[in-house]
Each structure stands twice: as structure tokens, then as C-alpha cells.
Amino acid sequence: MERLTIVKVGGEIIRIPEVRDSFLKDFSIIAGYKILVHGGGSMLTELARNLDIETQMIDGRRVTTEKILKLAVMVYAGLINKEIVVGLQALGVDALGFTGADSNIICSEKRPIRDSIDYGLVGDIQEINVQLLNEFLNKGHTPIFAPITHNGGGQLLNTNADSIAGELAKVLVYDYNVRLVYCFDKKGVLYDEGDENSFISVLSYTDFQRYKENGIIGGGMLPKLDSAFNALSAGVKEVIITCASNIKHTGSGTHLKL
């Protein structure tokens, strides 16, 4: 099977133009088919703060009110997505920007209230149009996904970018040899977020559960690792969490294993 690299890049990388441009240059030279999923939470939080709109996070996941959703669509599907697309086009990559609503490529349902926790207008992925995605890839396009989906009934939904990357990897594993890479501003998963030297080179699912229970791993890393291990369980060949500047180096970062 052909190789497909799915990269998720965090908002802390793309919010700084120089760092973003360096990352896009490295992404552009990845051989074979590739897909990029981007976040942008830090930019959304900053905009909400400037507009005096309250934001709330629960276990690393954003609570999405109607006001926050409007900002998310503007920031994610608008500014960030198009800056990435034009950056890659300038590097010779035929980038094509998407939300899940475009061509009905990712359909979600609103997350139900569980244990009295209501995440608001957050979407959990139900279906991905794999046939259409394959058509875009085979025509030489590089899909760039913003973390916005829809429910098929006219409602846009905020969907975790880590989850989108993981779900894309899971459904495409039947057609490609999939490599899934999560990029952010650290070397990889850390024992201590404040200590770069506490880098974990290999993380098993058993260790992940233990670290989660002990509070060693938490916050935004939880949905990232949940999605990553789900993808690994579904047959994705390689899952790595690494620093964006190391995307070219396959041996770097935290490698996950079941």
C-alpha cells in the first residue's frame, strides 16, 4: 500500500508566523500522500479574551458556547486554515482547505451531556467520506482540515483536532500505510511539563493509563493520547508525538505502543 502521513499541528505552532512557516516548509517535503489537521485553540482563547468572552476547559477539552463557536469558525476555518493553504501553495503543495461541512466530508453529532458535564456545541465524529477523501488525494491535493464539523442538519460543531486526525487515520488504514504524527511545542510527552529533560521516548498504553491516574499526564495531552492510542488499536502502523521542528526526523519524539 501507498504511504500516507497524517500530521496534526497545534495552535501554539501556527500562531507565530516564523514558526508556522518553518513547519510548513518541513511538512511540504514529506514524501507521499499527506494530510494536515490544524488546531488553533491558543488563538481562539486570545481572541475570546480580547472580546471579553468567557472560555472554559474541562480535562483539556473546550466548552463551546454559541459565541465561542462563532469565534472558532472565524479563527479555525477562516484565518488559520487559509494562511496554511496559501503558505503551502507558495511551497508548491496543492493544498485544499476543508471543514467537515465541506462536501459533507466529516459528519458529527453533538456530544451528549454525561455526568452532568455539557461541552456545548462540540461534535463527536460519526462518519467520514473516505471515497471523496481518496479522490482528492489521488488527484494530487493535500487536504488541510480545520477542526470544525457539522451534524448534517445545518449545525456547525467544534471538534477536537486531535480527534479528527485520529479518526482520519483509523478510516484510511484500509487504503494506506498510515503514519500519524502529532506536532506541538515540546520534544514529546513529558513526565514533567516544565522539564524538557523528562521526555518519554516510548509510551505504552499501560504506562499511559498509570500516568493518567497519577496525574502525571493531564490537560490537553489527554485527548491527544486518547485519540493516538485509539488509532494505534485500529491498525495505524506508527503513531508519534513530537516537536514540530523534528517532523522530518522519524526517530524523534514519543513513539506509542500498545
Curated annotation (Swiss-Prot):
PANTHER family: N-ACETYLGLUTAMATE SYNTHASE, N-ACETYLGLUTAMATE SYNTHASE, MITOCHONDRIAL. SUPFAM superfamilies: Carbamate kinase-like. Its EC number is 2.7.2.8. This is Acetylglutamate kinase. Belongs to the acetylglutamate kinase family. ArgB subfamily. Keywords: Amino-acid biosynthesis, Arginine biosynthesis, ATP-binding, Cytoplasm, Kinase, Nucleotide-binding, Transferase. One of its GO terms (molecular function) is ATP binding. Catalyzes the ATP-dependent phosphorylation of N-acetyl-L-glutamate. It catalyses: N-acetyl-L-glutamate + ATP = N-acetyl-L-glutamyl 5-phosphate + ADP. One of its GO terms (biological process) is L-arginine biosynthetic process. It is found in: Cytoplasm. GO terms for cellular component: cytoplasm. Its main location: cytoplasm. The lineage of its organism: Bacteria, Pseudomonadati, Bacteroidota, Bacteroidia, Bacteroidales. The keyword Transferase applies. It is an enzyme of class 2 (transferase). InterPro entries: AceGlu_kinase-like_sf, AcgluKinase_fam, ArgB, Asp/Glu/Uridylate_kinase. Pathway: Amino-acid biosynthesis; L-arginine biosynthesis; N(2)-acetyl-L-ornithine from L-glutamate: step 2/4. The record marks 8, 224 as: Transition state stabilizer. Substrate binds at residues 40-41, 62, 158.
